[in-house]
């Protein structure tokens, strides 16, 4: 577990991609640096497509798992305002401090709860979320199937889990989601390097009659 935790901690500190990794090197970066980093990420990753896949709107409650320094979190917060909520989880409290700084600069801090969680636990309360986002994080779980099964308990009826990751992780992510009892609703590749897959919880009756 210590080896796994160290790997996950490194991932959390690096963020969701190389661009986000730069953000964790110093908490004293200028506002201009943060803005340039965000603009580069937005151009490369098209985060509006992730928001669209989540199906969130004003008033929604969404979990951003492994949120890192918040390059995607800011977009989720904008989508759910003025009366929604984003719960941003990570195993590293220091990187969530960077997230807080990014949100404060954007005037979105009041919409986001930062939550430090254990490496192998979702840390989300039951039946409380319209959507759960896993962006470039699911392949690091030692038991992805068990994690996803636990996470489904946090969804409201009709809620969805969205997995976004690099293309070379697609097969593993899809297989784990299927084994966890999730039903694929849609899939897209808004940029050549990443896929977005939308899942809902399969009905218990889907496999047979009464």
Predicted feature locations:
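Conserved SAM/SAH-binding beta-strand->alpha-helix loop
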Residues: 92
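A short SAM/SAH-binding and catalytic strip from SAM-dependent methyltransferases
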Residues: 130-144
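A short glycine-rich, Lys/Arg-flanked "PGG" loop and its adjoining helix->strand segment in the class I
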Residues: 77-78, 145-160
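Conserved class I S-adenosyl-L-methionine
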Residues: 59-68
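Conserved SAM-binding strand-loop segment of SAM-dependent methyltransferases
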Residues: 107-120
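Bacterial signal peptide processing site
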Residues: 14-17
